[in-house]
């Protein structure tokens, strides 16, 4: 084993292999900072070049690209609240709040150091586990998959400071969306409204871009503010001090990174689980065991370490089932296995025997890529942090253009743009009402896999799986324990929950009513499908209807009370709000036993101080949505090459946020050139021929 370990390293000591490793990192980081493209797209585009490359050159380029994508995705998650890849959703929970406080440098340093440290810890574990690859990967069957997905959904419900019922409604909404499309077991088309473009389901990318990127841009456009305020002093000595503090804190609290790395590494061994689940479970476990669990989601370094410690380690773990059994843990590994097949290699025992040093070379590539990620992240941190100082109206056209192009790239039909518009409006609403888009995202991503494995489990074992699968029993017992403990805390604070106040009482009650009607309709439609195709959607619809009715009962008296009391200064969850900047103890009122009870400095950068300011911000947010919808419509009617730059130019010229005509002209020309170049490159790259989009 030791000989193979060192041989695997020396095999990388050729110029082509090292150059392709650096090239892959650079391409991956570029793609990772463009929401909507993703690792699958860039790896797929690399496949044609594989025919002219050696095995080590191919492996070096593709694995380094994956590492670059996932690291760069965390950068946009921190500075823009827009993860470049779905796997980086947990990073937004604490990374973006840190950036809003002016700690982007510290957050980026923690992210870079945690990524490197977690990846190297996983590489050490890899050395011991590669010998046990076969037995470890074959332990998981449909019951285990089903149980671990249930555990993942329950864990995400424990994260953040959002009322438990709202988290479950969000997760159930994500599950309901995941069942749209052709049922993989029976082939029945479910909830498609007879639209062929929905037969393949709802993509994660339009959802993520809508509820994260566009929603954030609309909010920033409405407030006319940047993510944070950065002056030259902060980007000088003060900024470097932030970076040093971030590195030092990561080493001081290394156990948070190590825990996430081990969890993600082990989850990476499970074929089909993917990095999304691994990252969320690592973050959820980190919160459960942390002394600052109640502060997770408010911008604590421990939360960011828990999220980023798993970023690279899960990719290291996914190598083992890919090369030992030919079983991918995610879509990225599907493309990687395809590349090995093109080169004449058959993943499995034959590969391990015929090329025993190859897995170790893969491990070294990931280790080197992790180190490069850390170094590049720290070197670029000052420049990347400047993004947070750009005001919303200036960033708006660029993010809108990327979102429209990215949504179409993911679905490859105009349905991607329609979905983007729908989810953007939904994102603005649910953000104001305090629902969890993260829970909805994990429901959307895991819903299909959960549905498949429930069917397989019941078909193979019936209810006997409880006695045949001890590992599944353990996962289910942990999930049940978490639900019961949350229920006990809710019962303890039940009266406080019933007195819950809301920032928008009437709007919240109307949303509850709409969700209840939607869930009941979903349940009724699901009843019309064959039993195998409709069982899980019907159960999910019933649960969503029950949770929505529960929210109706809670929110109705709150709305009645708000008609007599000015509740404009009460935020979602019924927390008493002090004046901005004041230090105070927050009393949990409406979070059903899962609230924060911490002493913190309140930040309300996005919240207007008066009713007049609030009305002005709401009007600007509505205008922002109209600009976004106009860009989407122009792209559909005129094509990307014309529609995107045209709307960018018009936006810049009529934008009153730019005081002088000269500034408007300069910004209009510059932004039009940038977005026009992006659109032209996009069209040329994908050779689109749909509805004249070339």
Which residue ranges define each predicted feature?
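Helix-loop-helix hairpins and the membrane-proximal interhelical loops
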Residues: 1-58, 134, 138, 189-300, ...
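Transmembrane alpha-helix interface/packing and boundary motifs in multi-pass membrane proteins
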Residues: 23-39, 69-81, 156-161, 261-273, ...
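Transmembrane helix boundary and interhelical junction motifs in multipass membrane proteins
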Residues: 33-45, 74, 84-89, 269-281, ...
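Hydrophobic transmembrane alpha-helices of multi-pass, membrane-embedded glycosylation machinery
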Residues: 44-49, 154, 172-177, 282-284, ...
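Membrane-interface alpha-helices at helix entry/exit sites of multi-pass transporters
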Residues: 56-60, 97-114, 291-304, 331-334, ...
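Membrane-embedded alpha-helical modules
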Residues: 109-222, 342-481, 485-489
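Membrane-interface interhelical connector segments
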Residues: 335-360, 385-391, 563-573, 591, ...
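Flexible extramembrane loops and terminal tails that flank transmembrane helices
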Residues: 491-637, 655-694
